[in-house]
Amino acid sequence: MGRIVSAVVTWGEAYLGVIGPFPVSIPWWSEVEPVAAHLRQVLDVPVFVLRLLLVDGGEGGRDGHVTYHVAALNRPAPGLLAERPIDQAGLAGPEELRSPWARLEGICEVLSWASDTLSAAGRRMTGPAVQRKTWNLAALFRLPTGKGPVWLKTTPRFAADEGSVIAAFARVDPVLVPPVIGAGPRRVLLGHLPGEDCWDTSPQIITSAVQRLAAAQAILAGQPASLPPGLPDRRTPVIAGQISALLDGPVASELSAGEVAAARGLISRFPLLDECGLPDTLVHGDFHPGNWRSDGGPAAIVDWADAHFGNPVLDGLRACDFLPPGKRPAAARAWIDAWASRIPGGEPARALRIAEPLAHLTYAVRYQEFLDGIEPSERIYHVGDPAAAIRAALRSAKDQR
């Protein structure tokens, strides 16, 4: 059905009215650039989309009738908005888990920081910021400069510090990561990477991306002092305990008793994974090809918000899972060869098989962290994901029998 949009518009503390519904060309809820562009045209004032309020229909973060809270920076001319009754107290009321960029003052603050940081770096902005994406996991703005666009990304408190993670990898392989122009707490300014995301890329780029990440991870595993401080710990004893705690929590009510018991049984695989000899290192955490960027040459890896310290097998599996079926063997072979050449006596092929169900359980923990860290109206992005990931783990284990 695609995505249709309604916008609840405020100016300062004043509720002005509603615009919509109107269609937009991109189905994904977090992609707000076409929403803001339509509203600027209709209202003839600059606006920012603050947050999602509700969704009717749609699933998986796309499609349906989506309602957003939108802040106008100037008061629009009268008569442009429909006066519909809404819960104004709920719209403007306090919410402990609200993202800083879901408040107008938070957007203004981070854009001011970005402007100052770019000026200090000799990359002064040449026009207004363009809001590209906003949701509970990040806000992304495109900033025009005389030397090309710069991307401002800001992330929540449960995300890894991308600036320090990228810096760690840049010391080992500068081409593996995007150029960082400036960084601060929960925010980073990145140089533009030409090209495309690598959802359906060539076997050569797949092999290069997988092997270069593994090579960098192997080096960082031997340099623990160079790892960023404050990394989430996902080493096998820790993640095993986190999975057990997850199964003790509310997610159990979404599963049958048999499913919970079977998921607990999978935790015993972690010691077997340790036997494979892979070192703990800096893990990307969401190494699917949509987070690889290439213009035909070696890919740069973006979106390091799920980075952590743990077993790199998670990255090998993520690459395989999201590629077209015919290209998955290339990723698996590249990953196995990369680690086999670096850990004499190790068993990376066995690690991939043992860890396949465990990867799904690890993502179940991560999805629960999302749900625990975001405000209620935005939980629709992730509701049901922990249970779905647990069931995926059970299917994976069953398929291996």
What residue ranges belong to the model's regions?
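Conserved Nudix-box catalytic region and its N-terminal flanking loop in Nudix hydrolases
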Residues: 1-45
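A short coil-to-beta-strand element that immediately follows conserved catalytic motifs
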Residues: 46-55, 124-131
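ATP-binding pocket architecture of kinase catalytic cores
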Residues: 59-60, 64-95, 129-233
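Juxta-kinase regulatory segment immediately upstream of eukaryotic protein kinase catalytic domains
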Residues: 81-129
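Active-site acidic catalytic loop and adjacent metal/ATP-binding pocket
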Residues: 130-146, 151-152, 180, 268-316
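A cross-family kinase active-site recognition segment
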Residues: 199-260, 278-280, 308-309, 355, ...
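All-alpha amphipathic helical-bundle segments outside canonical DNA-binding/catalytic cores
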Residues: 230-231, 344-358
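Active-site activation/catalytic loop segments of kinase-like enzymes and analogous catalytic loops
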Residues: 312-344, 357-376, 389-393
